[in-house]
């Protein structure tokens, strides 16, 4: 790789879609990231999917999950990179978006006729490059 190409990669941060994809594609790095972002220590990663597409009916809104990770204990982590310049999310919309993603993930996990006890422990994380609620906190959780 020439110096120009090397310098281009050195300037990228995890907020860049390309770099986020490269980093989260690696199960070891994805697990460390999940350990840092969740209140639990993740087990060994069983699988990582980038840009996982979920749509349960043709007429329903689909979601494309940036990084979908499942560990050996059945925990699921969806990590989304949210750049203000790429996609403005209003304060009222972000919690509703999380709710919708949770519902879509739950539908993916639970087959028809399966008891609700089999829903998995799930974490949905939005890494925002801005303060989405403008009250000067680094972490918001529900």
Task: Provide a role label for each language-model segment.
Residues 1-142:
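Elongated, amphipathic alpha-helical interaction scaffolds
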